[in-house]
Amino acid sequence: MDQQHGRNPRRRLLPRGVRTIAAAVAVACAAAVAVVTTQQSEAAAAPGEFYSPPAQIPAEPGTVIRTQPMSLLATLPSEQGWPGKAEHIMYTTRMQDGSPVAVTGTYIDAAGPWLGAGPRPTVVIGPGTSGQGDRCAMSQAFSTGITITTDPSPSLSANQELPSSAVWSRLGARVLVTDYIGLGTPGVHTYANRIEEAHAVLDGARAANKLAGTGPETPLVFWGYSQGGGAVAAAAEMQPDYAPELNLKGTWAGGPVADLAAILERIDGALIGGAIGFAINGLLARYPDLEKAVDRVTSQYGRDTLAALSDACIGDIITRYPFLKTSSLTHDGQPLGAHLQAMPEAAPALADLRVGTLTPATPVLITSGRNDDTVPYNQARQLADDWCAKGATVEFRTNELPPLLPGTTIPNHFGPEMIDGFGPDNAITYLLDRLAGKPAQGCTID
């Protein structure tokens, strides 16, 4: 293992034309989402028949269960809008215990030429946190950029993956964005569950290949930030055993949720502190032995709040539960994260869901903001160190954006996403190099 320190001399800028596409599309999508914040999309929010799985779910992971044409937000730097047709997709994946389950997502086929080297690839995107309610599913907000509902109560969810989807579509790649298990479809969304999120990403790649009429030899890359960064990191390390046939070339795991315990401690009392409820609810769904232990330490208000959060979207926790401190949910005023750390019943769950225990077989770029106030820098760096110690090929880049309004998430968590994902020296370059067959060098820690 060769671990280096300092900037990687092999990093290069994207070609000017590709940089222009990436920057223009990212800005246009962000502006479009801002414009539609005044619009309501009741139809998009209603799960409807499409999101209801059949009585018998095909057992084979990656099986396409059904598709449905869908429109896409057209506010892009082109009169033609998006360069490919899009579909809602439902496909088979596996729960933590191996049981088949239906998961939905968005598939965007490519129409224009592939602007990178080699054959046209598939890009599977692990989305960032959208919430835990069915209406929070990312696929329900691709038409408008945002979903606003008023029944039974006001709710808001934005599609954070419009920029990434649009950029890769403009470059000529096929794109699949998974909704994850339990978002849109029945059951609890198992937020930050390493195993189930990895399954959804890997089986999404299998389903995308089927829709494209291509085989597993199709070049594949993973892209994700925050919750999505953790999801694709987990997918990268599980791919050799779970989906060895896939031709994975590389992964960008930006600001990855790798150590759930560290995340719970960091966001407690922050603007999106309510996301702790997503994590607790997901744990209880897969580790029922935890329920009695959590009930013992939570007050009635705490239990009611956790139940309400199970149907909330990311916008809701900002408007209804801003800067939530979980000490307000417990009998003794101690944070829920501290209680979890002390519970013998929680130890297996927190260990199971930690990313970094396996070894990815293909190169991974990890980026993290030193001053990220939502997903701690140290646990992202630890993931890189863990993988490097196992002989993986990893590049770790530190984003030095200074602290701006600490605890409010947007500057110091989403700022590095835009810089590292779409800036002049970015994750797109890294993945294009992998698709072009350029070798990555050992372990580089920046």
Task: Please tell me what each predicted stretch does.
Residues 347-348, 389-446:
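C-terminal catalytic histidine-bearing segment of alpha/beta-hydrolase fold enzymes
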Residues 206-276:
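Primarily recognizes the serine-hydrolase "nucleophile elbow" in alpha/beta-hydrolase
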Residues 360, 365-372:
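Short beta-strand/loop motif that positions the catalytic acidic residue
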